Amino acid sequence: QRGVKFPCDALFRDGRLIAWLCPCREQANLLVRDGFEEYTPLALWKDYAARPLYGVSMLGTFHMPMRDGVELAADVYLPEGAPLPVPALLVRTPYDKDDGAQTYFRYVRRGYAVVVQDVRGRNESGGEWLPHYYEVEDGDDTLTWVGTQEWCDGSVGMLGGSYLGYTQWCAAALGNPHLKAMISVVTAGTAFADGPLHGGCFSSGGFAWNFAMTKRRFAPERMDRADWDEILDIRPLEDIGQKALGEDVPFIRKMLAHPCEDSFW
């Protein structure tokens, strides 16, 4: 229901609607009648909104080396005309860095560098795709790379929802000094308890997402099936990829091999 049932705030004065606010992940839609701005969050952002806007310049695609030698691809965007160095915002995604990157241009226009990275094994990044497994070390290494670039002032924030929110908590786990802020939305707590397994039981609801993540690029069409009841009856679960997709899915097998909260998680 995420596309149709966002919460809304309505503000009335003398029985008349004067403002309406609908928050949606990292953005919000606000409509307000002229003259009533002081009753809304706009009053808090008045000075910020008056600051100059910059153009968006793509510095390039960079392949960042991780501690084990694997390189992860990231696109870097800089505020055109802004005095460097500037603080940076980092987004780590399994859904292809070049898909929807324009969403983050509003931050570039406000004077931030933005770095959008494919996590390990996804899209243009090297290495093995194993959900959740590498995000702590990779996140820490990425923060260090971003924070030490000549265009960055050493301060890095992170943002994003769902898996993009999970990568933030992982990146924060080792206490990287460059990480100064996080906006983590609709995300999980731990990989074991809130991800593939819930209370020790493998979550059947996660198979649709797993199917969409079997290729190097996100393939949401693989979730759109009419035979999910039959698929979820397949036993053993390790065979679900071969029988439902006609191919083995190694990361599903690896997760199923660890039904307890051991060092894998």
Where do the PLM segments sit?
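N-terminal cap/lid segment of alpha/beta-hydrolase-fold proteins
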Residues: 44-84
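Acidic, serine/threonine-rich low-complexity disordered tracts
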Residues: 1-50
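Short amphipathic alpha-helix adjacent to the substrate-entry channel of hydrolases
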Residues: 93, 99-117
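Short beta-to-alpha linker loops that shape the active-site pocket of alpha/beta-hydrolase fold enzymes
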Residues: 80, 95, 113, 118-122, ...
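Glycine-rich "HGGG/HGxG" loop immediately N-terminal to the catalytic nucleophile
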Residues: 121-131
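Accessory cap/linker subdomain of secreted extracellular hydrolases
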Residues: 109, 173-265
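Alpha/beta-hydrolase active-site loop
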Residues: 130-150
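Alpha/beta-hydrolase fold nucleophile elbow
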Residues: 150-163
